[in-house]
Amino acid sequence: MVVGAFPMAKLLYLGIRQVSKPLANRIKEAARRSEFFKTYICLPPAQLYHWVEMRAKMRLMGFNAETIKPLNEEAAAELGAELLGEATIFLVACGCLVLEYSRQKTQQRRKEGEQLAAWDAMRDEVDHLALVLEALQAQVQAAPPPGALEELQAQMREVRAQLCVQDLPPAPQEEPTPRDEGPPDPGLGQD
């Protein structure tokens, strides 16, 4: 993934450079035309850049340069305009990076806000469910125990049975028949 990011970064840099190039060119032209701009804005950075560059080159080659001849005004103005153009491109690129960073931060804050809202909603739901659970537990504890319930059901059956017995009309009693009075006579009815 990192390897794929480098060409994209280079392409992004080239795109920003192309977009800011016209702006840099206009600034360069203004610097060349205006004496104030040339004298106070372009020349000092150009001379400083030339001095640092020459000093570094001399030290790398092993020479000890005590004085460095400054650039002539025309070369310094040209170098200053180029530096100003490159600085403009750099500032535009930095501005793009800052804008992208702030956009990502804003997006991250929004996402975190959504996550916090979802968390709060879940926490509220859990709190609500805890209250419902407590209410249900209170109802279960208030209900009679299962043994008492079975006992009440048995009592209800007994009461119903008693009510059913009382509601039935009394059954007529049968009168005893002669056959029922004693053992049957073996001789009777054998003629």
Curated annotation (Swiss-Prot):
Biological processes, Gene Ontology terms:
regulation of lipid metabolic process; visual perception
Source superkingdom: Eukaryota
Q: Please name one Pfam family that this protein belongs to.
A: OPA3
Q: Which residues form a coiled coil?
A: 120-143
Region of interest (Disordered), ranges = 163-191
Q: Which UniProt keywords apply?
A: Coiled coil, Mitochondrion
Tell me the InterPro entries matching this sequence: OPA3-like (IPR010754)
Q: Has the keyword Mitochondrion been applied to this entry?
A: yes
Keyword Coiled coil belongs to the record = yes
Look up the record and report any one GO term of the cellular component aspect: mitochondrion
Outline what the protein does.
May play some role in mitochondrial processes.
Per the record, the similarity remark reads: Belongs to the OPA3 family.
Give the protein name, as stated in the record: Optic atrophy 3 protein homolog
Q: Which gene encodes it?
A: OPA3
